[in-house]
């Protein structure tokens, strides 16, 4: 039987436990380690160092701010949304209180809502806002943020010819005298206004071009638009005849309002007899709307508002039907007649149209012009086209003089019963 005292003596004689040093710990960790463990551990430490270095360069610190990793950032969208302006509401400035003072107030009218007295936005100068213009206001304080252009009907905006026509004065034949008259009225005031200022006279404002169909009235208007850098607006007379009462007059007002916003503008009314006919009472009131449109046009031509650098060209085949109030000086200062071309003019027109054709060299254009008496430029163009058709039928690549003679026999003589030139000459 073991004695209790002997057990206690043995426990006292045992040595105290010795703690493991780093070498022992490293030795214990080396048990069961493969041959590449040390290299893997070195690579992992290098990866940690590189990751910490990248984070320092990016300026990123691990925090609880909720910022996602850079791979999920979309800086372009964030920048766009930060600079995106809220939509504005369209209003009209009706009156300015304390004009020229720093604390000026503006009375605006928001359609179908109410009237407000507001101030200017931070990005707008007081000189940019005038009475009567449209403005854009924010939806919170209704402060004026931007000035807006005047409201113009889309159909009027579509009338403007953006590109210059490719017709020059060299492409117009038989109208030498008429071109000179047009250049005096349209080109000279726009290109050399100082000549009129020195003499103390106002330049002519409008021109009426009249004559039979096909004599080059519209062609000369296109050549004028090419020559000047002014905006060219072509209006067909029938476009201003609208169904509802007041629509045609409103389109005329919008047309001249758009023209005044340009530096210089040429308005060409083609077939003006559609709206400019003499006033009469037929008893049924069918032409009342057309007459209202013409009265608005007369008011715009010579009303209270100065027209500035707006030149008006009008073309018609029937000058005898126009209203006398439309033709008086001050509205249409010059009347230019486009008659039938003479022999030299017809030969020149033949040369112009044959320039772009593959023709033989021995064609006598003066002889062809003698065979086309009382012909317009449109008739001569039809002759050239028909001569090309004769060459195509004969499977030739060059148009000969015989083709022109056959075309003259077909167009000028056979189609004479369809020609209305003599009738229009009676009207003109």
Curated annotation (Swiss-Prot):
Keywords: ATP-binding, Cytoplasm, Nucleotide-binding, Nucleus, Proteasome. ATP binds at residues 211-218. The keyword Nucleotide-binding applies. GO terms for biological process: proteasome-mediated ubiquitin-dependent protein catabolic process; ubiquitin-dependent protein catabolic process. It comes from the Eukaryota. The 26S proteasome is involved in the ATP-dependent degradation of ubiquitinated proteins. The regulatory (or ATPase) complex confers ATP dependency and substrate specificity to the 26S complex. PANTHER family: 26S PROTEASOME REGULATORY SUBUNIT. Belongs to the AAA ATPase family. This is 26S proteasome regulatory subunit 7.
